[in-house]
Design a protein with these regions (language model features):
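Aromatic (Trp/Tyr) and acidic
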Residues: 21-56, 69-78, 121-122, 128-206, ...
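Surface-exposed, short loops/turns at beta-strand junctions within beta-sandwich domains
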Residues: 83-91, 192-198
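Boundary at the C-terminal end of the N-terminal hydrophobic targeting segment
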Residues: 17-19
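Acidic, Ser/Thr/Gly/Pro-rich low-complexity segments and short DxT(G/T)-type signature motifs
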Residues: 86-115
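Low-complexity, Pro/Ser/Thr- and charge-rich linker/hinge segments at domain boundaries
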Residues: 107-129, 210-248
Length: 689
């Protein structure tokens, strides 16, 4: 589950360990702190005993202080911090502990220093500003400032052996100050002069070195590929098999049969008797670690379509190894249908709602079951799924999405375009009718989406008048763009609801309306740019934003900035996007990459049913899952120090364990949707077939 870079960090160790506790690595946490990393097959955060500091000796002398941190992981990770006199390059150290004796020669070019936080996967070459952070944290010893002169640093290119090679650049770390969001005393390492390529490593004088990292090139290409394909892996109603996956873990189509129960909307409480009428439906996505399909998921195809409109040159067919040729039952026949993969993915996310639509145009809110599917591949699904209630919000959103897809797909398939356009009007009329019956108006969000897309496709004058008259409504995006994505199912604004109008030819648009939409987008961008500057780490999350996954939702937060960069070409916009997207890949207080299978400090146990199966098979978790990450104050999961709402900074409130859905689950619409398009844009498209 975890990569140990012994070749790169060149530790010389003699190891003895108990049957339960296994010694893994010597690290540093400061220029006078040696860190010992143990893993245990027992989930006991008090297993490592430091109550007698005299038993922890370095070169025969008791450590000046002994601190620790422990947390549930796989099964338990334990980090012991030994404060010693200032470390000296070339000096040999013998460490005696109650759990064994270890020897190493300190070399700051070889030993890993956990205080250095980098993007462990790929910094974007499009950005002119890149950085790493540095912060000392000693578990129950708390955070620590650097005393005395600030150290220098050097960036080296690594040789194939993992040893440092050519010097790339150097400088001195810069003090940022104490950060409220993380609790850290933060220092900055400027990487702006590091050119495209890699692998590189940062060496901080007297402290140690970072994890390796790359800039652009194949590193960004791999990130783009893995991130985009997270959507494919989350598809419902399809096999996930070789050669379209590194391993075949779902050999049967799943969740095709839906029982028409029309039950109330609720989490895991829908009882299916098995005698109800059924329909067959393919497409859409599993919600998260479970398999329900929900209205919120329409933000995925909406975002994919907008991204293709804005950056068509970056997306092609046969780009992401996604099957796109099927028989009538959606058995895979091959790929290469001549349609860009991003539009194939958009169709998969859209077509479920086509199959789910009633004859009168209404659409149920989604599918649900009673309880949860077992933690294994959906080949072994043992739950029946039924439809939730018919909901006008669903048909309202679908009316805009159907027209959006119909317009974009028309050059590739006119018949399919016509079908979706007809369904769009059917959905819109059903929604208006149902809202009227309930003495309510259709939300402005969906009204705008429908009217913009229908006007751009058909030239309908009445739709255009609506768009012009209500353009100011879009300013509400400023207050909703960074909220929990459930709000997009009614009052929350997506850029997709109006951005197509901005991109349309001037001959088809009204200048005042375009300006109103651009003003709304600009105000949103300005707000997020300010939020980016609030915290020392590039998470861009205001302190009052606290929904599940909000601290790793940089894709959602940066998407309006990406679109403004498209319109203006301003370098400052892509710089901020790039820096914020570094956060989830390791440039965070925990130094953890929250996207599965990438980076060096990886997520052990995503709360994901099919990953439980792939891990059991020895393949590791399914690739590209961006878990919720830190920020939710979990209960009843072992950790030391105990995670507390009153004392633990939000960016350190994280435990990596399967059952911890607050930290280690994810959703298709919150976690995977936006990064799946932002990372390919930062890579300049994906071309490394």
């Amino acid at each position: 589950m975890r990569t140990i870079l012994t070749a790169i960090f060149g530790l010389f160790l003699t190891i003895s360990a108990s049957a339960k506790l296994t010694f893994r690595e010597i690290r540093t946490a400061a220029d006078n702190v040696i860190e010992l990393f143990y893993v245990s097959d027992t989930l006991d955060v008090n297993e490592v005993d430091i109550s007698d500091p005299a038993q922890w000796k370095v070169n025969g002398q008791p450590a000046l202080a002994v601190n620790r941190i422990a947390a549930a992981a796989d099964q338990c990770d334990n980090f012991i911090y030994l404060t010693v006199p200032t470390l000296e390059n070339g000096k040999k150290y013998t460490i005696d502990t109650p759990y064994g004796s270890y020897k190493f020669k300190f070399n700051d070019k070889e030993v890993f220093c956990e205080a250095i936080k980098t993007n462990q996967v790929a910094y974007s070459a499009l950005s002119t500003k890149r950085f790493a952070n540095m912060a000392i944290y000693l578990g129950d010893g708390g955070t620590r400032k650097i005393e005395g002169a600030l150290p220098g640093y050097t960036v080296y290119k690594l040789k194939k052996s993992g040893k440092v090679g050519k010097k790339i650049c150097s400088g001195q770390v810069k003090e940022i100050g104490q950060d409220r969001s993380s609790g850290d005393f933060v220092y900055r390492i400027d990487l702006s002069q590091v050119p495209e390529g890699g692998l590189y490593k940062i060496v901080v004088d007297g402290y140690g070195s970072s994890y390796p990292f790359g800039v652009g090139s194949d590193f960004s290409q791999k990130l783009a590929y893995v991130s985009f394909r997270s959507l494919f892996n989350q598809r419902c109603g399809i096999q996930i098999i070789e050669p379209y996956s590194d391993f075949s873990y779902r050999t049967k189509r799943c969740h095709e049969t839906i029982y028409q129960t029309y039950d109330r909307i609720g989490e895991a409480r829908l009882v299916v008797k098995g005698t109800e009428p059924t329909i067959q439906a393919w497409g859409g996505y599993h919600d998260a670690g479970d398999a329900d399909r929900r209205t919120y998921h329409m933000d995925v195809p909406s975002t994919l379509l907008t991204t293709y409109e804005a950056f068509p040159e970056l997306f092609t067919d046969n780009q992401f190894n996604i099957p796109d040729i099927f028989d009538e039952q959606f058995n895979i026949l091959g790929k290469g249908n001549g349609i860009p993969d991003i539009l194939d993915e958009a169709e998969w996310g859209t077509m479920f709602w086509k199959y789910f639509q009633e004859e009168d145009g209404q659409i149920p809110w989604g599918t649900e079951t009673n309880g949860y599917s077992p933690f294994t591949t959906y080949d072994f699904e043992d739950h029946l799924f039924g439809s939730e209630t018919l909901d006008p919000r669903t048909s309202a959103w679908a009316s805009g999405l159907f027209y959006h897809f119909a317009r974009i797909i028309k050059p590739f398939d006119e018949a399919k375009s016509a079908e979706y356009a007809a369904r769009a009007d059917l959905a819109y009329n059903a929604s208006v009718r149902t809202y009227a019956e309930r003495n309510r108006e259709m939300p402005a969000t969906f009204c705008m989406y429908y009217n913009v897309e229908k006007y751009l496709m058909t030239g309908d004058a009445e739709c255009h008048e609506y768009v012009k008259a209500h353009a100011a409504d879009a300013m509400q995006i400023v207050d909703t763009y960074n909220q929990g994505s459930e709000i997009f199912a009614e009052r929350g604004w997506l850029t997709s609801y109006f951005f197509s109008y901005i991109l349309a030819p001037e001959s088809k648009t009204d200048a005042a309306t375009v300006k109103a939409f651009k003003d709304a987008l600009q105000a949103t961008v300005d707000k997020q740019m300010a939020a980016f500057l609030e915290n020392a780490y590039p998470n861009g999350t205001p302190m009052n934003v606290t929904w599940w996954g909000s601290n790793v939702a940089q894709g959602q937060y940066t998407y309006p900035i990406v679109l403004m960069w498209k319109l203006t070409g301003k370098q400052e916009y892509i710089d901020v996007v790039s820096q914020m997207m570094d956060y989830a890949l390791g440039l965070n207080p925990l130094g953890k990459c929250f996207m599965t299978t990438l980076g060096y400090n990886q997520v052990h146990w995503p709360h994901d049913r099919e990953s439980a199966y792939t891990i059991e098979q020895g393949w590791g978790p399914r690739p590209g899952i961006l878990v919720f990450g830190p920020g939710n104050y979990v209960r009843n999961y072992p950790s030391y120090p105990v995670i507390s709402r009153n004392s633990t900074p939000r960016e350190r409130a994280y435990i990596d364990i399967l059952d911890n859905y607050q930290n280690n689950e994810y959703t298709i619409y919150q976690s995977l949707c936006f990064p799946s398009v932002v990372y390919p844009i930062l890579a300049g498209g994906y071309t490394s077939h």
